[in-house]
Amino acid sequence: MVTIRLARGGAKKRPFYQVVVTDSRNARDGRFIERVGFFNPIAAGQAEALRLDLDRIEHWLGLGATVSDRVSSLIKDAKKAA
């Protein structure tokens, strides 16, 4: 099953997440189909905290992809800000 979820990057104690489309059987930080955005939970100042390609996310949802709980709330925030 295809899912849209977060893949963790960054350094220890300084997380940075990629929003990726992947097969649910793949590892959290493993192979993915497409990168559709990023989320920086510790963004400060003028740093961009969230960027999502909503068109591509809608495309994948139309094809039957499921969304993780956290990504669902991020999509909601991005739509509210747009």
UniProtKB/Swiss-Prot annotation:
GO cellular component, one term: cytoplasm
Gene Ontology molecular function: structural constituent of ribosome
Highest rank taxon of the organism: Bacteria
GO process terms (BP): translation
Keyword entries, A-Z: Ribonucleoprotein, Ribosomal protein
InterPro entries (alphabetical): Ribosomal_bS16, Ribosomal_bS16_CS, Ribosomal_bS16_dom_sf
Keyword RNA-binding: no
Gene3D superfamilies: 3.30.1320.10
Pfam families associated with the record: Ribosomal_S16
Family: Belongs to the bacterial ribosomal protein bS16 family.
Protein name: Small ribosomal subunit protein bS16
